[in-house]
């Protein structure tokens, strides 16, 4: 055996040692590692990322990619450029050891935040991808895999983010490469350099172009997944293409397309181009297409290049077939997973606690980042009391926090001073003006003295206590009444709180109104009793008592077409609880004395309350309005009295005004003033009258009388019967309320009929609003009765058939008569 020369032997061993050294110096990443800056040390000989770990090169535009780059299954490798020049990353190796790139895990090459185009290149060696790889950029980078041996069984996604600057994908160096996985494209141009073997998929997505020239693509599936996808052909072999439709298509750049032939039975489309159709290519697109929807486009611009010679064919309808199963969905690969810190709580410089929590998200460049949220927890509202030799002042202090326009937190303090209150307000008017977008609250007040107090607390846990300031006047509102159940445009009476030290400080009540959006809005108003203007000594000790005041309102349409609501306060009744009178000058100049009546009752909480009657009607503009009802004052003795009334037709009649004491629907006492025409009954004799019928016939009718109890000379009831024939007549009960029910009781054998008419509770019909209601009374009688309307616009008609004979009696009993409606009853009863 021939021995090697000594020099040659040493050379051989040196080469072996060098190879061993190169292999042994590659760094192995076994835990999550983030490296910043260009060309970090320790990675110049290659790197291997173990499973369940990642290696991230950040804030750089160039790093080594030497000899061997391997990512094990479960591992990940990230190249991330943050605000640098575009990537300049190139593979390299020693002269006798080819470069190896092997990915079993995840690789992301992210140049989206670069400020110029870059490149990531494998120039030779071998490239094997059995995992997931994403190339992404914003400036039109070139991602090139020029290895001698290329195999892809996994997923490769070339995703540009700019429509104007699509990136370029290059795979292959002229050699055949194998694809059994999926290659996805978005905002990408991919120019094929040789045929692709294997049964894989090329998915051409948004604003992407796949140029296959004339290479054999029969083993691959091309999927046009977006309406802007383009496939470029130069003739040659048959190509399977899926997803043709919605405007995407096929470009033949070398000659104008002449004809399209589609065979629905085979799913094959033949395209001829050039003079006399000398060029031809065949595309398998599948069954289900409509040949009339194919279109040859005369001019189109693709990735900045114009094609103006009928070079593009497209299908206007949707693709009839689903995506092929061999093509994986084109889903973006996220960057390395963030370790989101746990939340924590701290105390800031303002003295209140902050809770800081973290989350992972993407920024405006689709880069994952960690964000944080800070929740500010200010202390509870507290009270500070200041005392000197003259006054005691209580301050309510709260803190408000927020975020300023610069994103920084701010805090300010609010202080409400309860002290040196101005009272003695004689009148207060609240006006709410709606203009469909905002409301304005105007308060008019007059004042005449001040006082201060301390140690205030609400008088009722069921009420609402609030402190508000208007026109520099602090108002304490302590409302016991429950207004939430009250309807819109309603008057709500409440038991108020009186603070007393020989003088009064009264809270008023709450009004519910509806704004322009038909939303019920409660208005809380404060009213003060008149007090001694000479009072100068501060009141520091107050005694609580209860008193009621009444608030009503008028809603009208103002000249500016805005709804205006005016709140009015009416004084409480006199201490004796009696009605009081007021002098009113009418529009025509006459003067009359009116009585204002009231009802003293209790509210739902058992508190005493006083109600002044009111009428809801409409004003001249057709808007709802509420007015206070007054009645002419009775004689000083309180007895019934008569008054002379001039009717609209000029006739004069004498009316009797009397009072009825009864109970309302909830059993509370109520007083009703009734007005009945005064009829002289000197003789009580029957008389005749001439009646002209609607058919112009004239007849004479007999008017007879029955004496019971009615307002005559002896205050007896006078019931008239007008008889023409034993037919049905109509009875009108004028001035009654809704809903009348009747029952007939036969309590005597020869028939004495007792009919009880019960007025059921309903919505009050008020003056100025006309309501006609009717119901039928089936009374035991062959003859009828009729009545006329008198003295009121509100009428209710009862139809009755009444049987009566000798000794029969007819009686009407009203179980319930509601407040503030003058009642005139005139019954015409026919007697047999």
UniProtKB/Swiss-Prot annotation:
User: For this UniProt entry, what's an example GO CC term?
Assistant: extracellular region
What terms describe the molecular function in GO for this protein?
A: cell adhesion mediator activity
Superkingdom of source: Eukaryota
Quick check: keyword 4Fe-4S in the entry?
A: no
Q: Where is this region: Disordered?
A: 722-747
Q: Keyword RNA-binding, does the record have it? A: no
What does the record note about the induction of this protein? Induced during biofilm formation on catheters inside the host. May be repressed during biofilm formation ex vivo.
> Keywords in UniProt for this one?
Cell adhesion, Cell wall, Glycoprotein, Secreted, Signal
InterPro entries for the chain: AWP2-like_YTTT_rpt, Hyphal-reg_cell_wall_N
Q: Which Pfam families match?
A: Hpf1_C, Hyphal_reg_CWP
- Main subcellular localization, coarse class? secreted
**Intracellular or extracellular location(s):** Secreted, Cell wall
What is the annotated role of this protein in its UniProt record?
Mediates cell-substrate adhesion and promotes biofilm formation.
Q: Name it.
A: Adhesin AWP2
Recorded source organism is Candida glabrata (strain ATCC 2001 / BCRC 20586 / JCM 3761 / NBRC 0622 / NRRL Y-65 / CBS 138) (Yeast)
Please name the gene that encodes this protein.
AWP2
């Amino acid at each position: 055996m021939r021995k090697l020369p000594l020099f040659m032997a040493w050379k051989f061993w040196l080469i072996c040692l060098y190879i061993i050294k190169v292999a042994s110096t590659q760094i192995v990443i076994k835990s999550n590692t983030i490296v910043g800056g260009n060309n970090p040390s320790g990675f110049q000989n290659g790197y291997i990322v173990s499973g369940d770990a990642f290696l991230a090169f950040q804030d750089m535009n160039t790093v080594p990619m030497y000899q061997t780059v391997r990512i094990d299954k479960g591992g990940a490798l990230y190249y991330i450029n943050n605000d640098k020049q575009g990537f300049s990353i190139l593979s390299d190796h020693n002269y006798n050891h080819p470069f190896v790139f092997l990915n079993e895990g995840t690789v992301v090459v992210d140049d989206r935040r670069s400020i110029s185009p870059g490149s990531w290149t494998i120039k030779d060696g071998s490239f094997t991808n059995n995992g997931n790889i994403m190339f992404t950029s914003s400036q039109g980078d070139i991602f090139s895999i020029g290895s001698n041996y290329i195999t892809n069984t996994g997923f490769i996604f070339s995703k540009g983010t700019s429509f104007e600057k699509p990136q370029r994908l290059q795979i292959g160096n002229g050699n055949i490469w194998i694809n059994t996985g999926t290659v996805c494209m978005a905002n990408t141009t991919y120019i094929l350099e040789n045929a692709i073997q294997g049964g894989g998929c090329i998915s051409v997505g948004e604003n992407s172009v796949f140029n296959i020239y004339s290479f054999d693509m029969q083993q691959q599936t091309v999927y046009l997944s977006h309406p802007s996808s383009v496939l470029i052909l130069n003739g040659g072999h048959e190509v399977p293409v899926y997803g043709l439709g919605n405007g995407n298509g096929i470009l033949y750049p070398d000659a104008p397309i002449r004809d399209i032939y589609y065979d629905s039975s085979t799913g094959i489309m033949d395209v001829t181009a050039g003079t006399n159709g000398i060029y031809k290519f065949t595309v398998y697109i599948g069954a289900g297409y409509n040949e009339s929807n194919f279109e040859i486009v005369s001019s189109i611009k693709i990735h900045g290049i114009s094609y103006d010679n009928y070079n593009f064919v497209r299908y206007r309808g949707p693709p009839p077939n689903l995506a092929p199963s061999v093509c994986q969905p084109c889903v973006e690969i996220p960057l390395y997973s963030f370790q989101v810190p746990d939340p924590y709580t701290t105390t800031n410089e303002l003295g209140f606690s902050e809770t800081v929590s973290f989350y992972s998200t993407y920024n405006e460049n689709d880069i994952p980042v960690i964000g944080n949220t800070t929740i500010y927890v200010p202390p509870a509202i507290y009270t500070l009391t200041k005392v000197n030799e003259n006054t005691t002042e209580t301050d309510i202090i709260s803190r408000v926090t927020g975020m300023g326009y610069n994103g920084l937190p701010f805090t300010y303090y609010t202080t409400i001073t309860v002290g040196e209150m101005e009272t003695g307000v004689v009148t207060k008017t609240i006006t709410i003006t709606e203009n469909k977008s905002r409301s304005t609250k105007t308060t008019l007040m007059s004042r005449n003295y001040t006082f201060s107090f301390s140690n205030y607390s609400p008088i009722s846990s069921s009420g609402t206590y609030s402190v508000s300031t208007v026109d520099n006047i602090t108002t304490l509102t302590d409302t016991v009444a429950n207004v939430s159940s009250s309807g819109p445009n309603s008057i709500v009476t409440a038991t108020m709180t009186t603070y007393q030290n020989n003088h009064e400080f009264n809270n008023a009540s709450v009004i519910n109104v509806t704004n322009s959006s038909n939303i019920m809005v409660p208005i809380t108003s404060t009213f003060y009793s008149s007090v001694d203007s000479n009072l100068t000594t501060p009141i520091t000790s107050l005694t609580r008592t209860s008193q009621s005041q009444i608030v009503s309102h008028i809603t009208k349409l103002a000249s500016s077409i805005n709804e205006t609501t005016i709140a009015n306060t009416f004084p409480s009744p006199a201490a004796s609880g009696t009605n009081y009178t007021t002098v009113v000058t009418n529009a025509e100049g006459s003067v009359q004395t009116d009585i204002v009546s009231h009802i003293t009752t209790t509210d739902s909480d058992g508190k005493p309350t006083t109600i002044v009657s009111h009428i809801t009607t409409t004003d001249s503009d057709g808007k709802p309005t509420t007015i206070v009802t007054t009645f002419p004052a009775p004689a000083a003795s309180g007895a019934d009295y008569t008054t002379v009334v001039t009717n609209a037709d000029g006739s004069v009649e004498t009316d009797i005004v009397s009072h009825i004491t009864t109970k309302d629907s909830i059993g509370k006492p109520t007083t009703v003033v009734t007005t009945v025409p005064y009829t002289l009954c000197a003789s009580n004799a029957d008389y005749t009258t001439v009646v002209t019928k609607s058919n112009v016939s004239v007849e004479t009718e007999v008017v007879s009388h029955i004496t019971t109890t009615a307002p005559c000379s002896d205050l007896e009831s006078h019931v008239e019967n007008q008889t023409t024939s034993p037919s049905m007549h109509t009875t009108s009960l004028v001035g009654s309320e809704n809903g009348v029910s009747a029952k007939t009781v036969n309590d005597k054998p020869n028939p004495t009929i007792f009919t009880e008419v019960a007025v059921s509770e309903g919505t009050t019909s008020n003056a100025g609003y006309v309501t006609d209601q009717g119901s039928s009374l089936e009374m035991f009688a062959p003859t009828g009765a009729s009545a006329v309307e008198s003295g009121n616009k509100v009428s209710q008609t009862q139809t009755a058939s009444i049987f009566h004979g000798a000794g029969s009696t007819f009686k009407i009993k009203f179980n319930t008569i509601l407040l503030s409606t003058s009642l005139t009853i005139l019954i015409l009863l026919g007697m047999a």
